[in-house]
Amino acid sequence: MQLSPERCRPMSENREAWSANSEEMELLHGSNRLSSPEHVRRRVSGNSSEDGSPRICRQQSFGRDIGHAAAETYLITRLSFNLLGYLGVGYRWITRLLALACYAMLLMPGFLQVAYLYFFSSQVRRSIVYGGHPRNRLDLYIPPTSDGLKPVVVFVTGGAWIIGYKAWGSLLGLQLAERDIIVACLDYRNFPQGTISDMVSDAAQGISFVCNNISAFGGDPNRIYLMGQSAGAHISSCALFEQAIKESRGESISWSVSQIKAYFGLSGGYNLFNLVEHFHNRGLYRSIFLSIMEGEESFKQFSPEVRLKDLNVRKAAALLPHIILFHGSADYSIPPEASKTFTDALQAAEVKAELVMYKGKTHTDLFLQDPLRGGKDELFDHIVSMIHADDSDALRNDAVAPPRKRLVPEFLLKLAGRVSPF
């Protein structure tokens, strides 16, 4: 069954249809049918009985998890070869590939711990299908408690528009779930499987799915936050702008911008005209970037900062939610100026917007090294405090929450920071 990019029916009408997708989708989705948290808890609590049947259930579940892990590993490997094929053999790419390999090895102790939880935690519902295209899946991170409706974060991961993958948001999802926040990490078609319009369409459809169905998982449809990191910040901001424009024109919509309480943009770029040469010099060559973005003639359409200057979209700008941009001052992958100029453009259009700049932080410090370090994390605390701002009980719980566990020794984090290609 193909789901219309503009419409997503209620979950109860589509539960059976979602299982009838392509072989590739079934390989990665496995037997992970859409089910509510109540079903998840019932399955987990059913692991004890007198006739010994739970052992068979656990063995079958373990086998499915192993199969799913193998399928996910295959996909990640294929994405890596996609990157290899499209970047070609150049000195910039080779040096960054070697640096990336060293970077990943240094952080491997943390990655392995996160991967184990991703594949085997009962709080993670992997590869829920939200649309009819390949890669139209999302992961849900569900808090351990089930009292009351929870706030929701829809997260669109980065990956240079080429290697984005929903599991990249697993650490964020696991940590926010511990603070009683549901997280939906969206997957989407990457280049060359799709170009920027496909990515934006996928993100919009994933957001629509969450808006229309998250209540079945204990999520509050009136407390949904949209967040994107790096390329994901660009894609999600484009999806948000497109939706606001459609809404301002009175077009048929399956979700409303008013359902998004706030937008968090982390280390993103929002003006393609200012980024093409920068990316070329860093190894994402101009020809590839133009192919991803459907040519320079499409730059304006997919540059939210530029579109704000168009008087025809000012009505749409008035519909946008509170926008908070986060950036590290030492980010060389996407210059911090990208968030500053976007904030200025938003404020000039009378959109409620603010910029939070983290001194000395790089592109990966905010999203990887700092969360792996454990303990206090300014970005994490800022996001949680904004989500829980109207919930006094949640704020009290946050104040006494135990410090987050360190996942990687400090000396490895420092070495990783030195060799990071980002």
UniProtKB/Swiss-Prot annotation:
Annotated binding of substrate, by residue: 158-160, 229-231
Keyword Endoplasmic reticulum assigned: yes
Compartments (UniProt record): Endoplasmic reticulum membrane; Golgi apparatus membrane
Transmembrane segments: 97-117, 152-172
Coiled coil spans: none
Chief location: endoplasmic reticulum
Its biological purpose: Catalyzes the demethylation of isoprenylcysteine methylesters. May act as a negative regulator of ABA signaling.
Family according to the record: Belongs to the AB hydrolase superfamily. Isoprenylcysteine methylesterase family.
Official protein name in the record: Probable isoprenylcysteine alpha-carbonyl methylesterase ICMEL2
Lineage of source species: Eukaryota, Viridiplantae, Streptophyta, Embryophyta, Tracheophyta
